[in-house]
Structure formats: C-alpha cells, structure tokens
C-alpha cells in the first residue's frame, strides 16, 4: 500500500485546503477519509493512515502563509490573524507528539518557519495600522463562486 502513500498525502492536503478555504475550519482524519470515499473500504484494500493525514496537515500549514498574503493583497486584513491562530494551535499540537527522526519530524520542523512568516505578516499589518480594519464587504476567506461545487462538497461531508 506504500505505493499510494504519496498520492494519498497529496489528496489529503487538497481536501484539507479546500475545506479550510471554504469554511475556515479543519477536518478530522475520519472526515477526510469520508470525503475521499475510502472510509467504508476494508483496511486491506485502502485506508488513510495517521502518517498520511499528518503529512497532509503539514502541507496545509505550509500553504497557509501564502493564503494569508493573498488575502492581505485582496484587502482582507483580519483573516491572517485567524490563520495565524490556527497555525499556532496546530504547531502546539504537533509539539505534543513524540515524533521520531523521520520524514514527518523533518516536515514538522518546517512549521516553525510558517509561524514566523505569519508573525511577520501580522507585524506588518500592525505597523501599518491595518489589523482589524477590514470592511464588512471583505470575505473571511476566499469566496467560492461555484455554488454547485460548494453544495456537493458539503453534501459529501455529511
């Protein structure tokens, strides 16, 4: 089953990213497996391992500073604060895990650089007096314009 591990990590990342962009929330391992349609498969056929889920979560965290910068460019100055809070919570949770010196540990170490990038974004916004100045017309995250996609995505989760 290791032959699919790289694809599974990428798929987990995509599901986590899309759900985060649409809702601003994270998905559990079980919810990701449900979205991917592998929650009811026998374990000997295909399953989502904790390692694959954690790799996908780290990939999400690595992408969030970019999303934060994009939202600032679009005029949403409040979202980076929420994103930074989520990343800090994820980082704290990963610190509690006893990770061995393997690829997951090396990827976990990259989170501290993402935390730093988000802190720099918040620092810049604070210096410019922009933190907390988003108008009510600015979306929380990136708006999804395709209602059919959004409805299918939510239906798949339930």
PLM features per residue range, with description:
Residues 33, 76-85, 132-140:
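Long amphipathic alpha-helical coiled-coil segments
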Residues 1-40:
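Long, charged all-alpha helical bundle/coiled-coil segments in cytosolic proteins
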Residues 102-158:
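C-terminal accessory extensions/subdomains outside the catalytic/core fold
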Residues 11-22, 58, 65-72, 91-98, ...:
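A structural signal for well-ordered alpha-helices, especially hydrophobic packing surfaces
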């Amino acid at each position: 089953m290791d032959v699919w591990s790289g694809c599974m990590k990428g798929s987990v990342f995509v599901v986590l990213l899309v759900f985060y962009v649409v809702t601003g929330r994270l998905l559990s391992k079980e919810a990701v497996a449900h979205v991917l349609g592998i929650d009811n498969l026998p374990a000997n056929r295909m399953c989502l391992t904790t390692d694959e889920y954690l790799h996908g979560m780290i990939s999400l965290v690595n992408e969030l500073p970019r999303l934060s910068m994009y939202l600032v460019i679009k005029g949403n100055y409040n979202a980076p604060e929420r994103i930074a809070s989520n990343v800090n919570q994820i980082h704290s949770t990963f610190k509690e895990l006893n990770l061995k010196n393997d690829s997951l540990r090396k990827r976990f170490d990259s989170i501290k650089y993402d935390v730093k990038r988000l802190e720099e974004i918040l620092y810049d916004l604070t210096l410019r007096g922009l933190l907390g100045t988003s108008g009510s017309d600015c979306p929380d995250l990136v708006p999804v314009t395709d209602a059919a996609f959004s409805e299918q995505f939510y239906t798949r989760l339930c």
